[in-house]
Amino acid sequence: MPLKILVAQINCVVGDVATNASKILSIVDQAKSESVDLVVTPELSLCGYPPEDLLLRPDFLKECHLTLKRIANHISGITLIVGHPHREGHYLYNAASVIQDGQIVARYFKQELPNYRVFDEARYFKAGEQSVVFSVAGVSVGLNICEDVWGEGGREASTESKVIEHPARAVSSVKESGADLLVVMNASPFHSGKDLIRRKVVQTQARLHTLPIVFCNLIGGQDELVFDGGSFSCDRNGEISAQAVFFNESLMTITLDQEQISSEFKERLLDSERATYEALVLGVRDYVEKNSFPGVLIGLSGGIDSALTLAVAVDALGAKRVKAVMMPSQFTASMSREDASTMASGLGVDYSEIEIKPMFDSFMKGLSGEFLGKAFDTTEENLQSRIRGTLLMSLSNKFGSLVLTTGNKSEMSTGYATLYGDMAGGFAVLKDLTKQAVYRLSVYRNTISACIPERIIERPPTAELRADQLDEDSLPSYEILDAIVEHYVEYDRGVDEIVALGYLPEDVKKIVWLIHVNEHKRRQSPPGVRVTARGFGKDWRYPITSKYRGLIDQ
């Protein structure tokens, strides 16, 4: 008899146990009406992922335990797998419970606990040791949780895109226990190219074990992380048999008939620019919605960073929930004002202009005695930025909207940003995009609709904090800068390795030096969407006080 499976690719809110449970039960009721045998939910679906130090609170764990019991009481005539934290004795486990007819008939504890980059599960959980295989409609189903299927090569696959052709021990254990099918519950966060890596990992394990696999992933934004969904299944030969959508909830049905696994869900993978853009949109939307902000504020400069930020915000929230503010100074070019106004008008957002020169002049008058005999320098440049930051935060304070900052990864790497100025805000949309990536995504966004004026994309980047200023007056070309940042930050390559790739030693040394001396700035920056293999968030934990400079004196 065929086994009908519903893969519940859902957006779970961290800490909102009751709402997550209600969503799961609603899906179960729908599945029963469609004669589904088995409902699969993502990793830690009951409490959301990652719950971080909520896992250290006894009251939080108690709520999860009591809610799980209530869910179990509701289940009849169907099998549900739900992810949750579970305390047993002195130990806490990343668990999955199998519920049938009001009873928890099996419970699995995750065996491979990732403890690298954005993951720190060893801080909270003890690794499980036993495989679990249970029966549904005459089919023996095994369970794994996320990293289990990646096995010993999980770190290399996730961070370096190297998939090891080696059987994962948790998968082997399930196969040896007689499983006909493996279900993998996941909370696997997005970065560019991760979808292909996941596929290759799972296909490899399916082929090595001649075992069909169903991969259920979480979707949604959680602070800096975005979970992109893209759940799928593959047959015992590793051939993809079903593919769910990315960046949206999905209830994907799959049928296992003997050894054949089939589905009508055949979504396509997304290209890199589209996937990254949709990650930004989902990250902004969920950060705003889940934290109950009424809308967002953006300082619109007429430059490409704020233009892309505005486009993402409107796509995430709609024009009515976005306000753009242009704050020109005596150094602002007329084309900047024109382009900012044109873009805001085209998108239909609330737009206003506030001249900052009167405020700047007042500050300079007040500081004239202290600054007597001192030439104009970055102090006056940063003062303009801090005036703008103060204005945006005042509007945020008055109306409750969240300020979206517009700085990019190139600027965050080198400290080309002003503390309490353009860094002032609550969420940094472009924080993990290099300047060149900002240009690529802006071009991509204009293929959907031409909302970013071409002149913004074509003109040389400038902060417009002094006369005739260009970014490359202070920094190497972004082509060189971005490449060095990617090698050093994302792939941990050393100075000598990067120089050996053909970059000038002076450029590499300068950029690496800037990366390390600006750690104090990054530590005070708002969270932002992670879209690369390594961002400046949970997966970048360098000390502020440190003399290390990448061995650049050797």
Language-model segments: which ranges?
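ATP/NTP-dependent adenylation/nucleotidyl-transfer catalytic domains that generate, transfer
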Residues: 3, 210-211, 236, 264-301, ...
